[in-house]
Amino acid sequence: MKNKSSMELSIRYGILFAIGVISIVCRLIATTDSHLIPGLGSMYYPLQVRCLLERGTLGYSDVPLVFWIEALAARIIILVSSMPVSDSIVFACRLVNAIVPSLIVIPVFYLTLSVSKSKIHPAYLAVILALSVLNPSVLVLFAIDFDKNAISMLFVYMTLYYLWQFSNNRKTKELVMVAGSVMLTLLTHFGCFSSLFIFLLVFTSVTGIFSISRIIKWFRESGIRIVFVAFSLLALILLPFLLKLYDNQRFLHLISYFSDPLQIFRNSFFMLICQGNLSWDWQNLLYLIIINSFSIMSIILFFRIRKRMGKEQSIFYLSLVIWFVLLSNPFINTAIYNRLLFISLIPLTVITIFIFQYCRKPVRIPIAIVLALLLTLTVATSGVRRTYISKEEYLELSSLRTVIPNPSSTIVLAQHRLEFWTSWTLRIKSGQLAGIKPYEYPKYSQVLYVVQKSNQFQEEIPKNASLIHTGKYFDLYRIY
Protein backbone atom coordinates (compact mmCIF):
# COMPACT_ATOMS: atom_id res chain seq x y z
CA MET A 1 0.00 0.00 0.00
CA LYS A 2 2.85 2.36 0.89
CA ASN A 3 4.64 1.60 -2.39
CA LYS A 4 1.43 2.23 -4.34
CA SER A 5 0.92 5.56 -2.58
CA SER A 6 4.51 6.60 -3.31
CA MET A 7 4.11 5.63 -6.96
CA GLU A 8 0.89 7.65 -7.30
CA LEU A 9 2.61 10.65 -5.72
CA SER A 10 5.56 10.26 -8.10
CA ILE A 11 3.19 10.15 -11.08
CA ARG A 12 1.47 13.34 -9.92
CA TYR A 13 4.75 15.19 -9.46
CA GLY A 14 5.86 13.87 -12.84
CA ILE A 15 2.74 15.37 -14.43
CA LEU A 16 3.41 18.67 -12.62
CA PHE A 17 6.98 18.77 -13.91
CA ALA A 18 6.00 17.77 -17.46
CA ILE A 19 3.24 20.40 -17.82
CA GLY A 20 5.54 23.07 -16.39
CA VAL A 21 8.32 22.20 -18.85
CA ILE A 22 5.89 22.12 -21.80
CA SER A 23 4.66 25.58 -20.82
CA ILE A 24 8.20 27.00 -20.61
CA VAL A 25 9.20 25.44 -23.94
CA CYS A 26 6.08 26.73 -25.72
CA ARG A 27 6.63 30.24 -24.37
CA LEU A 28 10.28 30.18 -25.43
CA ILE A 29 9.37 28.90 -28.91
CA ALA A 30 7.05 31.89 -29.32
CA THR A 31 10.10 34.19 -29.24
CA THR A 32 12.93 31.96 -30.44
CA ASP A 33 12.97 33.09 -34.08
CA SER A 34 12.82 36.78 -33.30
CA HIS A 35 15.66 39.30 -33.42
CA LEU A 36 14.04 41.08 -30.50
CA ILE A 37 10.73 40.36 -28.77
CA PRO A 38 7.63 39.60 -30.85
CA GLY A 39 4.34 41.32 -30.29
CA LEU A 40 2.95 44.83 -30.54
CA GLY A 41 3.86 46.37 -27.21
CA SER A 42 6.49 43.89 -26.08
CA MET A 43 9.38 46.41 -26.16
CA TYR A 44 7.65 48.16 -23.26
CA TYR A 45 9.20 45.70 -20.82
CA PRO A 46 12.89 45.97 -21.86
CA LEU A 47 12.46 49.75 -22.01
CA GLN A 48 11.15 49.90 -18.44
CA VAL A 49 13.92 47.56 -17.25
CA ARG A 50 16.60 49.68 -18.91
CA CYS A 51 15.22 52.77 -17.17
CA LEU A 52 15.31 50.93 -13.84
CA LEU A 53 18.92 49.81 -14.32
CA GLU A 54 20.14 53.20 -15.51
CA ARG A 55 18.05 55.63 -13.44
CA GLY A 56 16.50 53.56 -10.68
CA THR A 57 12.99 54.58 -11.77
CA LEU A 58 10.48 53.46 -14.39
CA GLY A 59 10.22 55.37 -17.65
CA TYR A 60 6.40 55.12 -17.63
CA SER A 61 4.09 55.13 -14.61
CA ASP A 62 3.10 51.56 -13.76
CA VAL A 63 2.95 49.03 -10.95
CA PRO A 64 6.56 47.86 -10.58
CA LEU A 65 6.89 44.24 -9.46
CA VAL A 66 7.37 42.58 -12.87
CA PHE A 67 9.96 45.17 -13.87
CA TRP A 68 11.82 44.65 -10.59
CA ILE A 69 11.97 40.91 -11.27
CA GLU A 70 13.12 41.41 -14.86
CA ALA A 71 15.69 44.03 -13.81
CA LEU A 72 17.12 41.62 -11.23
CA ALA A 73 17.36 38.88 -13.86
CA ALA A 74 19.00 41.31 -16.30
CA ARG A 75 21.53 42.43 -13.66
CA ILE A 76 22.51 38.82 -12.97
CA ILE A 77 22.90 38.07 -16.70
CA ILE A 78 25.02 41.20 -17.17
CA LEU A 79 27.30 40.16 -14.28
CA VAL A 80 27.81 36.52 -15.32
CA SER A 81 27.91 36.83 -19.12
CA SER A 82 29.64 38.84 -21.83
CA MET A 83 26.38 39.75 -23.58
CA PRO A 84 25.84 43.45 -24.38
CA VAL A 85 23.60 45.23 -21.89
CA SER A 86 20.71 45.66 -24.34
CA ASP A 87 20.81 41.99 -25.32
CA SER A 88 20.98 40.99 -21.64
CA ILE A 89 17.87 43.04 -20.87
CA VAL A 90 15.89 41.55 -23.76
CA PHE A 91 17.02 38.02 -22.85
CA ALA A 92 16.07 38.57 -19.20
CA CYS A 93 12.57 39.70 -20.18
CA ARG A 94 12.16 36.66 -22.42
CA LEU A 95 13.36 34.34 -19.69
CA VAL A 96 11.15 35.79 -16.95
CA ASN A 97 8.10 35.73 -19.22
CA ALA A 98 8.76 32.08 -20.06
CA ILE A 99 9.46 30.76 -16.56
CA VAL A 100 7.44 32.76 -14.02
CA PRO A 101 3.95 32.34 -15.61
CA SER A 102 4.66 28.61 -15.97
CA LEU A 103 4.91 28.43 -12.16
CA ILE A 104 1.10 28.77 -12.13
CA VAL A 105 0.99 24.97 -12.18
CA ILE A 106 2.37 24.84 -8.61
CA PRO A 107 -0.49 26.53 -6.69
CA VAL A 108 -3.01 24.86 -9.02
CA PHE A 109 -1.37 21.47 -8.30
CA TYR A 110 -1.61 21.86 -4.52
CA LEU A 111 -5.11 23.32 -4.72
CA THR A 112 -6.19 20.29 -6.76
CA LEU A 113 -4.68 17.84 -4.27
CA SER A 114 -6.30 19.70 -1.37
CA VAL A 115 -9.79 19.79 -2.92
CA SER A 116 -9.60 16.15 -4.03
CA LYS A 117 -7.86 14.98 -0.83
CA SER A 118 -5.06 13.63 -3.07
CA LYS A 119 -7.44 11.19 -4.76
CA ILE A 120 -7.74 12.77 -8.20
CA HIS A 121 -7.01 10.58 -11.22
CA PRO A 122 -3.72 11.48 -12.97
CA ALA A 123 -5.52 12.08 -16.28
CA TYR A 124 -7.82 14.67 -14.70
CA LEU A 125 -4.86 16.25 -12.91
CA ALA A 126 -3.05 16.60 -16.24
CA VAL A 127 -6.08 18.32 -17.81
CA ILE A 128 -6.41 20.77 -14.90
CA LEU A 129 -2.72 21.70 -14.87
CA ALA A 130 -2.69 22.06 -18.66
CA LEU A 131 -5.80 24.23 -18.49
CA SER A 132 -4.03 26.57 -16.06
CA VAL A 133 -0.98 27.32 -18.28
CA LEU A 134 -1.68 26.04 -21.80
CA ASN A 135 -4.97 27.88 -22.29
CA PRO A 136 -5.40 30.63 -24.92
CA SER A 137 -4.97 33.42 -22.35
CA VAL A 138 -1.69 32.38 -20.74
CA LEU A 139 -0.07 30.58 -23.68
CA VAL A 140 -1.18 32.68 -26.66
CA LEU A 141 -2.43 36.13 -25.68
CA PHE A 142 -0.10 36.60 -22.68
CA ALA A 143 2.90 34.77 -24.16
CA ILE A 144 4.63 37.77 -25.71
CA ASP A 145 2.86 41.08 -25.16
CA PHE A 146 1.50 40.89 -21.65
CA ASP A 147 4.13 39.79 -19.15
CA LYS A 148 2.31 41.51 -16.30
CA ASN A 149 -1.02 39.81 -17.07
CA ALA A 150 0.49 36.33 -17.13
CA ILE A 151 2.62 36.78 -14.01
CA SER A 152 -0.21 38.35 -12.02
CA MET A 153 -2.32 35.26 -12.72
CA LEU A 154 0.24 33.27 -10.70
CA PHE A 155 -0.46 35.46 -7.66
CA VAL A 156 -4.23 35.20 -8.18
CA TYR A 157 -3.95 31.39 -8.09
CA MET A 158 -1.80 31.66 -4.95
CA THR A 159 -4.51 33.78 -3.34
CA LEU A 160 -7.17 31.21 -4.22
CA TYR A 161 -5.06 28.35 -2.82
CA TYR A 162 -4.38 30.04 0.51
CA LEU A 163 -7.98 31.26 0.78
CA TRP A 164 -9.17 27.69 0.23
CA GLN A 165 -6.79 26.49 2.95
CA PHE A 166 -7.99 29.19 5.32
CA SER A 167 -11.67 28.46 4.68
CA ASN A 168 -11.06 24.83 5.69
CA ASN A 169 -8.43 25.16 8.43
CA ARG A 170 -9.07 28.66 9.85
CA LYS A 171 -5.35 29.22 10.50
CA THR A 172 -4.20 32.82 10.80
CA LYS A 173 -0.94 32.17 8.92
CA GLU A 174 -2.96 31.20 5.84
CA LEU A 175 -4.84 34.49 6.05
CA VAL A 176 -1.46 36.24 6.15
CA MET A 177 -0.50 34.39 2.95
CA VAL A 178 -3.77 35.49 1.36
CA ALA A 179 -2.96 39.11 2.20
CA GLY A 180 0.57 38.74 0.82
CA SER A 181 -0.66 37.19 -2.43
CA VAL A 182 -3.24 39.96 -2.89
CA MET A 183 -0.51 42.56 -2.40
CA LEU A 184 1.70 40.85 -5.00
CA THR A 185 -1.23 40.85 -7.44
CA LEU A 186 -1.77 44.58 -6.95
CA LEU A 187 1.94 45.31 -7.52
CA THR A 188 1.86 43.27 -10.72
CA HIS A 189 -1.30 44.09 -12.67
CA PHE A 190 -4.22 46.38 -11.95
CA GLY A 191 -6.74 44.43 -14.06
CA CYS A 192 -6.08 41.09 -12.35
CA PHE A 193 -6.16 42.77 -8.94
CA SER A 194 -9.55 44.33 -9.76
CA SER A 195 -10.88 40.91 -10.78
CA LEU A 196 -9.47 39.32 -7.63
CA PHE A 197 -10.97 42.12 -5.54
CA ILE A 198 -14.39 41.25 -7.00
CA PHE A 199 -13.92 37.59 -6.02
CA LEU A 200 -12.91 38.49 -2.47
CA LEU A 201 -16.04 40.62 -2.10
CA VAL A 202 -18.19 37.80 -3.48
CA PHE A 203 -16.53 35.19 -1.25
CA THR A 204 -16.90 37.39 1.84
CA SER A 205 -20.58 38.01 1.07
CA VAL A 206 -21.40 34.35 0.39
CA THR A 207 -19.52 33.24 3.51
CA GLY A 208 -21.34 35.83 5.61
CA ILE A 209 -24.73 34.65 4.33
CA PHE A 210 -24.22 30.89 4.73
CA SER A 211 -21.71 30.54 7.55
CA ILE A 212 -22.17 33.48 9.91
CA SER A 213 -22.62 31.36 13.06
CA ARG A 214 -19.41 29.43 12.47
CA ILE A 215 -17.51 32.67 11.83
CA ILE A 216 -18.75 34.14 15.13
CA LYS A 217 -17.68 30.99 16.97
CA TRP A 218 -14.21 31.16 15.38
CA PHE A 219 -13.82 34.79 16.45
CA ARG A 220 -14.87 33.98 20.03
CA GLU A 221 -12.06 31.44 20.34
CA SER A 222 -9.47 34.23 20.15
CA GLY A 223 -10.00 37.98 20.47
CA ILE A 224 -6.86 38.74 18.47
CA ARG A 225 -8.53 37.21 15.42
CA ILE A 226 -11.13 39.99 15.36
CA VAL A 227 -8.42 42.63 15.37
CA PHE A 228 -6.39 40.84 12.70
CA VAL A 229 -9.33 40.22 10.35
CA ALA A 230 -10.60 43.78 10.80
CA PHE A 231 -7.13 45.08 9.98
CA SER A 232 -6.94 42.77 6.94
CA LEU A 233 -10.32 43.94 5.61
CA LEU A 234 -9.34 47.58 6.14
CA ALA A 235 -6.05 46.97 4.33
CA LEU A 236 -7.91 45.29 1.45
CA ILE A 237 -10.21 48.30 1.10
CA LEU A 238 -7.26 50.71 1.19
CA LEU A 239 -5.08 48.68 -1.20
CA PRO A 240 -6.43 50.35 -4.36
CA PHE A 241 -5.16 53.67 -3.00
CA LEU A 242 -1.64 52.21 -3.17
CA LEU A 243 -2.10 52.27 -6.93
CA LYS A 244 -2.09 56.07 -6.80
CA LEU A 245 1.61 55.99 -5.87
CA TYR A 246 2.53 54.13 -9.06
CA ASP A 247 -0.11 54.98 -11.65
CA ASN A 248 -2.35 57.94 -10.90
CA GLN A 249 -4.16 57.66 -14.26
CA ARG A 250 -5.38 54.12 -13.54
CA PHE A 251 -6.29 55.14 -9.99
CA LEU A 252 -8.49 57.97 -11.28
CA HIS A 253 -10.05 55.55 -13.78
CA LEU A 254 -10.90 53.20 -10.90
CA ILE A 255 -12.39 56.00 -8.80
CA SER A 256 -14.61 57.05 -11.72
CA TYR A 257 -16.55 53.78 -11.39
CA PHE A 258 -17.48 54.62 -7.81
CA SER A 259 -18.87 58.01 -8.86
CA ASP A 260 -20.70 56.55 -11.89
CA PRO A 261 -21.02 52.75 -11.51
CA LEU A 262 -23.55 52.40 -14.36
CA GLN A 263 -20.87 53.29 -16.91
CA ILE A 264 -19.70 49.68 -16.73
CA PHE A 265 -22.82 48.68 -18.71
CA ARG A 266 -22.50 51.33 -21.43
CA ASN A 267 -21.50 50.19 -24.92
CA SER A 268 -21.82 46.60 -23.78
CA PHE A 269 -20.37 43.83 -25.89
CA PHE A 270 -23.78 42.20 -26.36
CA MET A 271 -25.41 45.47 -27.44
CA LEU A 272 -22.69 46.29 -29.99
CA ILE A 273 -22.94 42.78 -31.45
CA CYS A 274 -26.73 43.11 -31.80
CA GLN A 275 -26.35 46.50 -33.49
CA GLY A 276 -23.75 45.11 -35.89
CA ASN A 277 -21.17 47.65 -34.69
CA LEU A 278 -18.64 45.06 -33.59
CA SER A 279 -16.97 42.32 -35.61
CA TRP A 280 -14.89 39.47 -34.24
CA ASP A 281 -12.92 36.81 -36.07
CA TRP A 282 -14.09 33.23 -35.73
CA GLN A 283 -11.39 32.27 -33.20
CA ASN A 284 -12.45 34.96 -30.73
CA LEU A 285 -16.12 34.21 -31.32
CA LEU A 286 -15.52 30.50 -30.67
CA TYR A 287 -13.61 31.38 -27.51
CA LEU A 288 -16.51 33.55 -26.32
CA ILE A 289 -19.04 30.78 -26.97
CA ILE A 290 -16.93 28.17 -25.16
CA ILE A 291 -16.36 30.37 -22.09
CA ASN A 292 -20.03 31.34 -21.76
CA SER A 293 -21.10 27.72 -22.29
CA PHE A 294 -18.89 26.66 -19.39
CA SER A 295 -20.26 29.57 -17.37
CA ILE A 296 -23.84 28.34 -17.82
CA MET A 297 -22.76 24.75 -17.17
CA SER A 298 -21.04 25.71 -13.89
CA ILE A 299 -24.33 27.17 -12.61
CA ILE A 300 -26.28 24.03 -13.51
CA LEU A 301 -23.66 21.76 -11.95
CA PHE A 302 -23.72 23.70 -8.69
CA PHE A 303 -27.31 22.64 -8.07
CA ARG A 304 -26.43 19.04 -8.99
CA ILE A 305 -23.34 18.59 -6.83
CA ARG A 306 -23.80 20.95 -3.87
CA LYS A 307 -25.31 18.20 -1.70
CA ARG A 308 -22.14 16.12 -2.18
CA MET A 309 -19.99 18.94 -0.84
CA GLY A 310 -19.43 20.20 2.68
CA LYS A 311 -20.42 23.74 3.62
CA GLU A 312 -16.93 25.20 3.03
CA GLN A 313 -16.60 23.49 -0.35
CA SER A 314 -20.08 24.62 -1.36
CA ILE A 315 -19.37 28.25 -0.38
CA PHE A 316 -16.06 28.30 -2.22
CA TYR A 317 -17.53 26.71 -5.36
CA LEU A 318 -20.55 29.04 -5.39
CA SER A 319 -18.24 32.05 -5.03
CA LEU A 320 -16.20 30.81 -7.99
CA VAL A 321 -19.33 30.35 -10.10
CA ILE A 322 -20.59 33.87 -9.34
CA TRP A 323 -17.12 35.27 -10.10
CA PHE A 324 -16.95 33.30 -13.35
CA VAL A 325 -20.37 34.58 -14.44
CA LEU A 326 -19.41 38.18 -13.63
CA LEU A 327 -16.15 37.98 -15.59
CA SER A 328 -17.73 36.35 -18.65
CA ASN A 329 -20.84 38.56 -18.63
CA PRO A 330 -21.30 40.02 -22.16
CA PHE A 331 -23.57 42.80 -20.90
CA ILE A 332 -20.70 44.95 -19.60
CA ASN A 333 -18.63 47.57 -21.42
CA THR A 334 -16.80 46.06 -24.40
CA ALA A 335 -13.35 47.39 -23.46
CA ILE A 336 -13.66 45.88 -19.97
CA TYR A 337 -15.26 42.68 -21.24
CA ASN A 338 -12.37 41.95 -23.62
CA ARG A 339 -9.99 42.01 -20.66
CA LEU A 340 -12.14 40.14 -18.15
CA LEU A 341 -13.01 37.37 -20.59
CA PHE A 342 -9.42 36.16 -20.66
CA ILE A 343 -9.04 36.43 -16.88
CA SER A 344 -12.19 34.28 -16.55
CA LEU A 345 -10.08 31.22 -17.29
CA ILE A 346 -8.84 31.42 -13.70
CA PRO A 347 -12.22 30.58 -12.11
CA LEU A 348 -12.89 28.10 -14.92
CA THR A 349 -9.71 26.19 -14.02
CA VAL A 350 -10.60 26.01 -10.32
CA ILE A 351 -14.23 25.14 -11.07
CA THR A 352 -12.93 22.25 -13.18
CA ILE A 353 -11.18 20.87 -10.08
CA PHE A 354 -14.54 20.68 -8.29
CA ILE A 355 -16.24 19.18 -11.34
CA PHE A 356 -13.68 16.37 -11.54
CA GLN A 357 -13.97 15.79 -7.79
CA TYR A 358 -17.74 15.85 -7.28
CA CYS A 359 -19.36 15.05 -10.64
CA ARG A 360 -19.96 11.50 -11.80
CA LYS A 361 -18.06 9.85 -14.68
CA PRO A 362 -20.69 10.55 -17.38
CA VAL A 363 -20.09 14.27 -16.74
CA ARG A 364 -16.37 14.23 -15.95
CA ILE A 365 -15.15 12.26 -18.94
CA PRO A 366 -16.77 14.35 -21.75
CA ILE A 367 -15.59 17.58 -20.10
CA ALA A 368 -12.06 16.23 -19.76
CA ILE A 369 -12.01 15.12 -23.41
CA VAL A 370 -13.33 18.48 -24.69
CA LEU A 371 -10.80 20.44 -22.62
CA ALA A 372 -7.95 18.14 -23.67
CA LEU A 373 -8.80 18.61 -27.36
CA LEU A 374 -9.08 22.39 -27.01
CA LEU A 375 -5.75 22.61 -25.15
CA THR A 376 -4.05 20.38 -27.72
CA LEU A 377 -5.33 22.67 -30.47
CA THR A 378 -4.06 25.73 -28.58
CA VAL A 379 -0.56 24.27 -28.16
CA ALA A 380 -0.43 23.07 -31.77
CA THR A 381 -1.32 26.50 -33.15
CA SER A 382 0.70 28.69 -30.75
CA GLY A 383 3.98 28.67 -32.71
CA VAL A 384 6.48 31.44 -33.36
CA ARG A 385 5.21 35.03 -33.14
CA ARG A 386 6.39 37.97 -35.23
CA THR A 387 7.76 41.27 -34.00
CA TYR A 388 5.99 44.59 -34.39
CA ILE A 389 8.79 45.80 -36.69
CA SER A 390 11.10 43.85 -39.02
CA LYS A 391 14.90 43.75 -38.80
CA GLU A 392 15.16 46.24 -41.65
CA GLU A 393 12.66 48.59 -39.99
CA TYR A 394 14.52 48.29 -36.70
CA LEU A 395 17.83 49.30 -38.32
CA GLU A 396 16.27 52.27 -40.10
CA LEU A 397 14.48 53.41 -36.95
CA SER A 398 17.79 53.26 -35.04
CA SER A 399 19.48 55.43 -37.70
CA LEU A 400 16.95 58.25 -37.25
CA ARG A 401 18.90 59.52 -34.25
CA THR A 402 21.52 60.91 -36.64
CA VAL A 403 18.97 63.29 -38.18
CA ILE A 404 17.57 64.54 -34.85
CA PRO A 405 19.35 67.62 -33.44
CA ASN A 406 19.36 68.10 -29.66
CA PRO A 407 17.94 64.61 -28.90
CA SER A 408 18.24 65.14 -25.14
CA SER A 409 15.64 67.96 -25.25
CA THR A 410 13.47 66.44 -28.01
CA ILE A 411 10.36 64.30 -27.73
CA VAL A 412 9.33 61.96 -30.55
CA LEU A 413 5.63 61.13 -30.70
CA ALA A 414 4.33 57.95 -32.34
CA GLN A 415 1.32 55.72 -32.66
CA HIS A 416 0.54 53.58 -29.62
CA ARG A 417 3.14 50.84 -29.06
CA LEU A 418 5.54 52.28 -31.64
CA GLU A 419 6.54 54.86 -29.01
CA PHE A 420 8.19 52.07 -26.97
CA TRP A 421 10.29 50.94 -29.93
CA THR A 422 11.15 54.56 -30.72
CA SER A 423 12.33 55.27 -27.19
CA TRP A 424 14.27 51.98 -27.04
CA THR A 425 16.13 52.40 -30.33
CA LEU A 426 16.70 56.18 -30.30
CA ARG A 427 17.27 56.52 -26.55
CA ILE A 428 15.00 59.52 -26.62
CA LYS A 429 11.84 60.60 -24.80
CA SER A 430 8.80 59.31 -26.62
CA GLY A 431 5.04 59.27 -26.21
CA GLN A 432 1.69 59.13 -27.97
CA LEU A 433 0.30 61.99 -30.01
CA ALA A 434 -2.84 62.12 -27.85
CA GLY A 435 -0.78 62.08 -24.66
CA ILE A 436 0.97 65.42 -25.22
CA LYS A 437 -1.10 68.60 -25.36
CA PRO A 438 -0.02 71.58 -27.54
CA TYR A 439 0.51 73.78 -24.48
CA GLU A 440 3.18 71.29 -23.34
CA TYR A 441 5.24 71.63 -26.54
CA PRO A 442 7.38 74.55 -25.26
CA LYS A 443 8.89 72.18 -22.67
CA TYR A 444 10.96 70.70 -25.51
CA SER A 445 13.34 72.16 -28.07
CA GLN A 446 11.33 70.33 -30.73
CA VAL A 447 8.41 67.90 -31.00
CA LEU A 448 8.70 65.26 -33.73
CA TYR A 449 6.28 62.65 -35.03
CA VAL A 450 7.42 59.34 -36.56
CA VAL A 451 5.22 57.36 -38.97
CA GLN A 452 5.68 53.66 -39.72
CA LYS A 453 4.73 53.23 -43.38
CA SER A 454 3.82 49.54 -43.09
CA ASN A 455 1.17 50.21 -40.42
CA GLN A 456 -2.28 49.77 -41.97
CA PHE A 457 -4.02 51.72 -39.20
CA GLN A 458 -2.37 55.13 -39.30
CA GLU A 459 -3.33 58.05 -37.12
CA GLU A 460 -4.03 61.32 -38.87
CA ILE A 461 -0.83 63.32 -39.23
CA PRO A 462 -1.16 66.77 -37.57
CA LYS A 463 -1.96 69.48 -40.13
CA ASN A 464 0.87 71.73 -38.98
CA ALA A 465 3.47 68.94 -39.32
CA SER A 466 6.33 69.38 -41.79
CA LEU A 467 8.24 66.44 -43.26
CA ILE A 468 11.93 66.62 -42.29
CA HIS A 469 13.08 63.11 -43.23
CA THR A 470 11.74 60.27 -45.34
CA GLY A 471 13.06 56.74 -45.51
CA LYS A 472 12.02 53.40 -46.90
CA TYR A 473 10.08 52.40 -43.79
CA PHE A 474 9.63 55.57 -41.71
CA ASP A 475 8.80 59.24 -42.19
CA LEU A 476 9.77 61.85 -39.62
CA TYR A 477 7.73 65.04 -39.16
CA ARG A 478 8.30 68.13 -37.09
CA ILE A 479 5.25 69.40 -35.18
CA TYR A 480 6.93 72.07 -33.07
What are these regions (language model features)?
Residues M1-I29, R225-A230, I369, Y480:
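Start-transfer (signal-anchor) and selected internal transmembrane alpha helices
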Residues S5-I11, K119-I120, N169-T172, S211-V227, ...:
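Membrane-interface helix-loop-helix junctions at transmembrane boundaries of multi-pass membrane enzymes
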Residues I19-I24, P46, V66, C93-V115, ...:
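Membrane-embedded helix bundles of polyisoprenyl
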Residues S23, R27-T31, D62-V63, D147-K148, ...:
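Transmembrane catalytic cores of multi-pass membrane glycosyltransferases
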Residues L58-S86, T185:
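Short hydrophobic/aromatic helix or loop-helix immediately within or flanking a transmembrane segment
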Residues L134-S137, I355-Q357, I365-I389:
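Transmembrane alpha-helical segments
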Residues N149, S194, I332-K361:
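Hydrophobic/aromatic-rich transmembrane helices and adjacent perimembrane loops
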Residues T376, R386-Y394, R401-Q458, L467-I479:
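Short periplasmic/luminal acceptor-recognition loop of GT-C membrane glycosyltransferases, typified by
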